[in-house]
Amino acid sequence: MELYVARDKDGILTLFPCKPYCSESGIWYGETDGRDLVLKKDMLPEVTFENSPQKIEIALIK
């Protein structure tokens, strides 16, 4: 499953089902109806505002 993760200018980390867009104020928004998921700020420290959004792949481990 491919998703996108992006960090806002204020450090909020969000997971999106579709590629998000960034507002002029530095906040990432998805084109979905509230299916975005806010993650803990300390997760994925390699994702910064400057390199967002990042495409990630999630796999179930059995």
Regions found by a protein language model. Name each.
Residues 10-13, 53:
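Non-transmembrane, interaction-prone segments in cytosolic or luminal domains
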